[in-house]
A protein has these predicted regions:
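N-terminal cap/lid segment of alpha/beta-hydrolase-fold proteins
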Residues: 1-25
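Primarily recognizes the serine-hydrolase "nucleophile elbow" in alpha/beta-hydrolase
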Residues: 94-151
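The feature captures the conserved acid-bearing segment of alpha/beta-hydrolase catalytic domains
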Residues: 145-206, 210
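Alpha/beta-hydrolase active-site loop
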Residues: 78-101
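C-terminal catalytic histidine-bearing segment of alpha/beta-hydrolase fold enzymes
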Residues: 206, 213-249
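The serine-hydrolase catalytic nucleophile loop
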Residues: 36-48
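Conserved alpha/beta-hydrolase
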Residues: 49-73
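Short beta-strand element of the alpha/beta-hydrolase
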Residues: 25-35
Length: 249
């Protein structure tokens, strides 16, 4: 049995899932981030599955999504990368709340996410050493190279606009995994990708695995793919995530 309920932590709506009857007890805790234009409720099946396996799972609502959506879809579309940054920046305050409440068992903290959430996971892992295990589903940690084609804030078709785009997105250099791979792979890491993904190409994950391999950083990395699967989570992907955290967290 699983209990799920809504909370607001530091002004951020979250969905809280825990094994029935254990909500007030210290538990290994996973923070899960949902995808772009989605919501914490849509991805609540991750919370259910992780809670059923014995984990407390906290699903924060990304800025401009779900309960935080202002109704302006065009504005949200132009702020994908700002939302990613906000996810990463907001995580410590949420984590610290549950740590202060004594609800995290033995500092056993995991981060997980899909799509935008997978990208959030990778960016968070290289910034926050208190993360003990991380799982990225159909994500990428190479923000600057992906940003011109994945939800850029505006079309950049001239040298001037391309330069402006690069300037506007320069903040991503401090968040992406480039030059921080040792911090990404120093603890258990799961990378999952559907090979037919046409939104965030599987090559993003392949590139990461190649780069980690070149630096002999694959000892704690698990790389899983599924053929003919596009930009979506499968039942087997969810199972892989549960197995990963059950073993390493």
């Amino acid at each position: 049995m699983v209990e799920m309920f809504d909370e607001v932590i530091e002004g951020i709506p979250v969905l809280h899932a825990a094994p029935a009857g254990k909500q007030g007890q210290p538990l290994p805790t996973i923070f899960f981030y949902h995808g772009f234009t989605s919501s914490k409720e849509v991805y609540s099946y991750f919370g259910y599955a992780f809670a059923k396996a014995g984990f407390r799972t906290i699903l924060p609502e990304a800025n401009l999504h779900g309960a935080r959506f202002n109704g302006d879809s065009a504005f949200r579309l132009a702020h994908f990368w700002d939302i990613l940054k906000s996810n990463i920046d907001e995580l410590p305050a949420i984590y610290q709340h549950y740590q202060r409440e004594g609800l995290i068992l033995d500092n056993r903290v995991g981060v997980c996410g899909a799509s935008l959430g997978g990208m959030t996971t990778l960016g968070a892992k290289v910034r926050y050493p208190w993360i003990q295990a991380a799982a990225s589903f159909m994500g990428s940690g190479y923000y600057l190279s992906l940003a011109p084609t994945l939800f850029p804030p505006f079309e950049a078709q001239t040298p001037e606009t391309r330069q402006q785009l690069a300037t506007d997105l320069a903040f991503l250099a401090d968040y992406q995994v480039v030059d921080r791979l040792e911090k990404l792979a120093d603890k258990p890491l799961l990378i999952w990708h559907g090979l037919a993904d046409d939104l965030v190409p599987a090559e993003e994950s392949r590139r990461l695995i190649r780069d980690l391999g070149e630096q002999n950083l694959l000892a704690q990395v698990r790389f899983e793919t599924e053929p003919a699967i596009g930009h979506k989570i499968t039942v087997s992907a969810l199972d892989v995530g549960v197995q990963f955290f059950s073993r390493y967290l």
